[in-house]
């Protein structure tokens, strides 16, 4: 019985010592400067985003098609938070991440959203940023772009109580309803959206 206990103790100790090697990363990252990441796209484009209204979430994939794990030294938005883009990398939100491990022949999602600040103009404005990746001192990037458009916003059941014109200078976004009071006229210019 004593011999069985000692044998089980030795086996348990050996198994526990082997567990850290099972995560596949354990600081054995390749430092090969020829290894690169691959991406599912080189440009992540958003359709026109109305100012102050957030976008839908878009995504792209990071691939490590190499035969060894890599440590991504940094993943960051080139402009920080200045352009309104936000990202989630490997389940973490932020504009900058350091030392993100990726196994050999594995992949990882990057989720991106954008909210465009009003610019006071009537025409769509191109907003660009990049997600920058550094691996073994080599920088790679994925371009982010969206068109921001200021809108005339009517929110929460607005009632028009005097004669009005909806102009064609910028789009209208109506949440809930837009009611025209009795006896009031509403003219809509040609081309108004």
Where are these regions (language model features)?
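C-terminal motif of bacterial Sec signal peptides marking the signal peptidase cleavage site
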Residues: 18-21
């Amino acid at each position: 019985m004593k011999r069985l206990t000692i044998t089980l103790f030795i086996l348990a100790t050996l198994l526990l010592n082997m567990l850290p090697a099972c995560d596949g990363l354990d600081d054995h990252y390749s430092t090969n400067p020829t290894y690169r990441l691959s991406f599912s796209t080189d440009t992540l484009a958003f359709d026109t985003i109305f100012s102050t209204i957030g976008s839908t979430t878009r995504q792209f994939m990071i691939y490590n098609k190499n035969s060894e794990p890599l440590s991504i030294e940094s993943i960051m938005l080139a402009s920080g938070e200045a352009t309104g883009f936000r990202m989630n990398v490997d389940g973490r939100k932020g504009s900058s991440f350091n030392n993100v491990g990726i196994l050999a022949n594995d992949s990882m999602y990057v989720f991106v959203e954008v909210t465009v600040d009003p610019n006071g103009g009537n025409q769509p404005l191109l907003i660009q940023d990049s997600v920058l990746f550094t691996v073994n001192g080599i920088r790679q990037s994925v371009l982010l772009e969206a068109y921001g458009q200021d809108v005339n916003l009517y929110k929460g059941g607005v009632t028009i109580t005097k004669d009005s014109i909806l102009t064609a200078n910028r789009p209208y976004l109506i949440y809930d309803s837009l009611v025209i009071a009795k006896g009031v006229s509403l003219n809509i210019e040609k081309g108004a959206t």
